[in-house]
């Protein structure tokens, strides 16, 4: 694991700006308003040759009650305890404040290496603030500008000196290896020349390309990438119980929670292991209707949540048991499915429901009726607060992930297609039959299929949905979006023996 570096300091000294610079992209929300960061946020970054596991923390306030600020302080203290090295940031333009001095006292008691940096050190006012920071007792401060990238070389040297030669070399040796080409990428690369959106491509060429690619053989040869973490995003409306659910899963107060709606602002990522399987949990800010997203900061949080959803594998949509399946829930589910993510429906606060049997039947009925595109997504009824039924969530997530990554063998797929068309053929258009001829799965994540059919451009949307639902049931792909592209053209077997239809397909022996 890379060196764990916690960036700490009072509110609005530039911690998240420095965090984003070291990560190399904008992950933490940044705003002039103090207290933007509330949870501790983690990401991998780099400073020169030194790989880092960075922890961005909430601003440190000197409070001791049960307020939101006190809980934010507890998250910061947890980050300090977890880190190998602390980067203590002060504002050079303001100078040392009583809050900075209190924080310095806390760090001295923590018995952990500390690097002191004075941010916003541009200009004469900044120079005076750097000099003032000497009195905090952590040696020579590093003057820097996180916004403009100034002082990074000096920061690197200070971190290296604080670690010492042995710890520094160990940090370099224990860094994770660079990204390796994942299994399955070769398959997609072989199919890259097949543009299923290209309506100028003849069916003969498309069918030939599909068969030449020998998809089933490639899939059989490709090793299962079991070490790849499942990226699970926890999404939902504000105060639905998302952070409480993650804390219950992790068995720790990793996420800041409380009765106030909208506590989580950033998308917080936590690496976790469940029954030997690596999981990357992402807690997100609550999504509201657009007309209720008024503050600039909340708009930034909403955009960050949508970005996290787009990069997830599976989305757990958390809904309050007493307010489930409202319009905003349906819109979030629709967004996840349109982005090609697998979906698990989570009904939280189940410990507060009296008639659980009746409520469960009602919610499942609503899900089937109002979320037809979710395709029978599993529904898990649980309580993040008490842990009731919490053990049912991850098996449902892993099952949907397997469906999301599943592939149907081409032979099985076409046998199913022939049987389906024989029993329920597509309707005629202007007295002329539509003849589905050949189907292949082009990719997984999500499962994507192409169907070759005469007059395919005239196939009714209702029949396409019928085929998608049939694929879902026949190949057990529930809770995941299924994409079907229909292409038209002449009979690819015309002029051959048995030209009135496609030949029988045999299962490949892999």
Swiss-Prot record:
GO terms for molecular function: GTP binding. Residues 3-167, 230-405 form the EngA-type G domain. PROSITE patterns: G_ENGA. GTP 1 binds at residues 9-16, 56-60, 119-122. Residues 406-490 form the KH-like domain. It comes from the Bacteria. SUPFAM superfamilies: P-loop containing nucleoside triphosphate hydrolases. Keywords: GTP-binding, Nucleotide-binding, Repeat, Ribosome biogenesis. GTP 2 binds at residues 236-243, 283-287, 348-351. Signal peptide: none annotated. GO terms for biological process: ribosome biogenesis. InterPro entries: G_ENGA, GTP-bd, GTPase_Der, KH_dom-like, KH_dom-like_a/b, P-loop_NTPase, Small_GTP-bd. Belongs to the TRAFAC class TrmE-Era-EngA-EngB-Septin-like GTPase superfamily. EngA (Der) GTPase family. GTPase that plays an essential role in the late steps of ribosome biogenesis. NCBIfam families: GTPase_EngA, small_GTP. Associates with the 50S ribosomal subunit. HAMAP family: GTPase_Der. This is GTPase Der.
């Amino acid at each position: 694991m890379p060196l764990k570096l916690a960036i700490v300091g009072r509110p609005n000294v530039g911690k998240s700006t420095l965090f984003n610079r070291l990560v190399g992209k904008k992950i933490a929300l940044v705003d002039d308003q103090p207290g933007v960061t509330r949870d501790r946020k983690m990401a991998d970054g780099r400073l020169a040759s030194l790989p880092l596991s960075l922890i961005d923390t909430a601003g440190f306030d000197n409070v001791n009650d049960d307020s939101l600020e006190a809980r934010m302080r507890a998250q910061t203290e947890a980050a300090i305890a977890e880190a190998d090295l602390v980067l203590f940031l002060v504002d050079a333009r303001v100078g040392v404040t009583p809050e900075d001095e209190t924080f310095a006292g806390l760090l001295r008691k923590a018995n952990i290496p500390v690097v002191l940096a004075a941010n916003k050190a541009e200009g004469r006012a900044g120079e005076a603030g750097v000099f003032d920071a000497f009195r905090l007792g952590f040696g020579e401060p590093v003057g820097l500008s996180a916004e403009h990238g100034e002082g990074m070389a000096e920061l690197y040297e200070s971190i290296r000196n604080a670690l010492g030669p042995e710890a520094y070399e160990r940090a370099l040796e224990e860094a994770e290896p660079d990204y390796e080409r994942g299994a399955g990428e070769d398959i997609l690369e072989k199919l890259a020349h097949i543009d299923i959106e290209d309506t100028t491509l003849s069916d003969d060429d498309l069918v030939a390309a599909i068969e030449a690619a020998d998809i089933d053989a490639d899939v059989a040869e490709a090793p299962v990438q079991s070490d790849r973490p499942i990226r699970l995003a926890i999404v939902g409306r504000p105060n639905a119980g998302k952070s409480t659910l993650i804390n219950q899963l992790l068995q720790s107060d990793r996420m800041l929670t409380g009765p106030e709606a909208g506590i989580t602002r950033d998308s917080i990522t936590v690496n976790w292991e469940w029954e030997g399987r690596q999981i990357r949990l992402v807690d997100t800010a609550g999504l509201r209707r657009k007309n209720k997203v008024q503050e600039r900061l909340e708009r930034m949080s909403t955009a960050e949540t949508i970005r996290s959803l787009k990069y997830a594998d599976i989305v757990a949509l958390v809904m309050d048991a007493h307010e489930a399946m409202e319009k905003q829930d349906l819109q979030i589910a629709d967004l996840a499915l349109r982005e090609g993510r697998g979906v698990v429906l989570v009904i939280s606060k189940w410990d507060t429901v009296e008639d659980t049997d009746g409520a469960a039947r009602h919610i499942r009925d609503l899900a089937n009726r109002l979320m037809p595109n979710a395709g029978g997504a599993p529904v898990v009824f649980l309580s993040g607060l008490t842990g009731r039924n919490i053990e049912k969530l991850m098996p449902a997530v892993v099952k949907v992930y397997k469906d999301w990554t599943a592939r149907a063998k081409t032979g099985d797929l076409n046998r199913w297609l022939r049987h389906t068309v024989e029993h329920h053929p597509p309707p005629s258009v202007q007295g002329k039959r539509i003849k589905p001829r050949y189907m292949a799965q082009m990719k997984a994540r999500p499962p994507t299929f192409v169907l070759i059919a005469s007059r395919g451009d005239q196939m009714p949307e209702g029949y396409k949905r019928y085929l998608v639902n049939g694929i879902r049931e026949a190949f057990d792909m529930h809770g995941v979006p299924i994409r079907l592209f229909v292409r038209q053209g002449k009979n690819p077997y015309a002029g051959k023996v048995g030209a009135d239809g496609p030949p029988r397909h045999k299962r490949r022996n892999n």
